[in-house]
UniProtKB/Swiss-Prot annotation:
One of its GO terms (biological process) is amino acid transport. This is Arginine/agmatine antiporter. It comes from Chlamydia felis (strain Fe/C-56). It is found in: Cell inner membrane. Keywords: Amino-acid transport, Antiport, Cell inner membrane, Cell membrane, Membrane, Transmembrane, Transmembrane helix, Transport, Virulence. It is a multi-pass membrane protein.
Length: 486
């Protein structure tokens, strides 16, 4: 029997968990938000996009908050909610897909870090896939591995400091753009209906809204950070508070960051600024020192988010293995109660993926799009479980959240999750199914060696495996015959 160390320490409070949520959501992409939003929409459509996204993500955030309160026994909820509600195979598949998603996402942080360094040391790290960039990224993969090995609490403390440090440049950006804000400029072509010599018509408000929401929907990936770490939280209440605090804080920052520049620069000017566009905006408004500050902030943001996701990504297989869904070897801890084997295996897979970046940038970009879609079923399954549990007689109606509230929160979160999956791209979803099917042998292996073989291989679980395998084969056929193209 493999020893998995002592009982998991519950030493993360609301602040540490909120730092995890904010840091996992606010990565390097936020420093490109002004240009990304202005590229296809006017200020009016951007406001509508944030309102709709904010409402949708509120229901997802509230889903996690409610579940942490009414089912505090289910730790690392992003995986456990799926397992509890829909059986071991769905739980495994959600955990497997989420794990793969974050492995590739972390390597994306490595690429972005090296590319950001190129601003200070051109041309050695250009594109993030040169030999110096691969070496630098590989070193950082293992540096973060050893930081987390020192202990989750210590890593979380470093992450809180990093979160504060990356919010400072963003706060300075908000203050400067607010200082230069002119309402007359902001109101100019508010709905994006005027063409210029360099900028064609943006189209209807509906088309602007659709293209802009493709940006906003990814802004909140990571909202589940506190839930994933709930096994190490001081209390279920801390998980709920951290999720809502992180969501609210990020939404405010996103809205201000994407709208305030419209008060000092016109839409076509913002759309033409090179990324990271926060640096370009400050270069125009205050000079080169502003550009340098934003590029430093970009580096801090990426590194801080990378640390957060290193903690989170190792926690998924560790937690899944503790109840037998992943191979038992993932449960091994070190003296600091960090998931040692899970960290080493995860970092090794990241290292392999980092080497692949050197050979094929285009294939890597496609892989990031595919794995980005793979996180969304976890949101859908969690919301669906809340709907299911709200109808259960065991639901604690005497608690702070009534079943009626839980039910309709879950329903609205389900609807928004389905929209996210659709907007993410059906072709990427098909490829994601292929990657999910690759986990089937690991599920079978875990089932054979676990105590719950009958449950793992019950008729309904075999049916689910068969459906995923069939869909994966169908996807391979569609791609090989070019009926669907990436």
């Amino acid at each position: 029997m493999i020893s998995n160390g002592s009982k998991t320490r519950k030493n993360l409070g609301a602040i540490a968990l909120a730092g995890m949520v904010i840091s996992s959501m606010i990565g390097g992409g936020i420093f490109s938000l002004p240009q990304n939003m202005a590229a296809s929409a006017g200020a009016g459509a951007i406001i509508l996009a944030w309102i709709l996204t904010g409402i949708g993500m509120f229901f997802i955030a509230n889903t996690f908050k409610i579940l942490s309160l009414v089912r505090p026994d289910l730790t690392t909820g992003i995986y456990m909610y799926s397992r509890e509600g829909f059986g071991p195979y769905v739980g495994f598949t959600i955990g497997w897909g989420y794990w793969l998603c974050q492995i590739f996402g972390n390597v994306g942080y490595a690429v972005m870090t090296m590319d950001a360094l190129n601003y200070f040391f051109p041309p050695y790290f250009k594109g993030g896939n040169t030999i110096p960039a691969i070496i630098g990224g590989s070193i950082l993969i293992w540096v973060f591995n050893f930081i987390v090995l020192k202990g989750i609490r210590q890593a979380s403390f470093i992450n809180v400091i990093g979160t504060i440090c990356k919010l400072i440049p963003l706060l300075i950006f908000i203050i400067i753009t607010a200082f230069f804000f002119k309402l007359a400029i902001f109101k100019t072509d508010f709905w994006g209906h005027t063409a210029t010599k360099t900028q064609p018509l943006l189209g209807s408000v509906t088309s602007q809204l659709k293209s802009t929401m493709l940006v906003t929907l990814w802004a909140f990936i990571g909202i589940e950070g506190a839930v994933v770490m709930s096994a190490r939280a001081k209390s279920p209440n801390a998980v709920g508070k951290a999720t809502i605090l992180g969501f609210s804080g990020c939404l405010i920052v996103y809205v201000l960051l994407s709208l305030l520049p419209f008060g000092s620069l016109f839409q076509h000017q913002l759309a033409g600024i090179a990324n990271p566009s926060t640096a370009g905006v400050l270069d125009i408004l205050v000079g080169r020192w502003g550009e340098i500050l934003m590029n430093i902030g970009l580096l801090i943001a990426i590194l801080s988010s990378w640390l957060s996701w290193t903690v989170i990504v190792a926690e998924i297989p560790y937690s899944a293995a503790k109840n037998g869904t992943f191979p038992e070897i993932f449960t091994i801890e070190n003296a600091a109660h960090s998931p040692k084997v899970s960290l080493y295996i995860t970092s090794a897979l990241m290292q392999v993926a980092m080497l692949l970046v050197y050979f094929s940038t285009n294939a890597w970009s496609t892989m990031l799009s595919i794995t980005g879609v793979m996180v969304l079923p976890a949101y859908l399954a969690s919301a669906a479980f809340l709907v299911k549990f709200s109808k259960d007689k065991k639901y604690p109606n005497k608690g702070p959240i009534k079943s009626f509230t839980a039910k309709y929160t879950g329903i609205l979160a389900v609807i928004y999750s389905i929209w996210l999956i659709y907007a993410g791209g059906i072709k990427y979803l098909f490829m994601a199914i292929v990657l999910l099917a690759l986990g089937i042998p690991f599920y079978i292996e875990a089932g054979k060696k676990g105590k719950n073989a009958k449950t793992f291989f019950a008729k309904k679980e075999v049916t689910k495996i068969t459906i995923i395998a069939f869909l994966a084969l169908l996807a391979i056929f569609l791609f090989s015959t070019e009926r669907i193209r990436l």
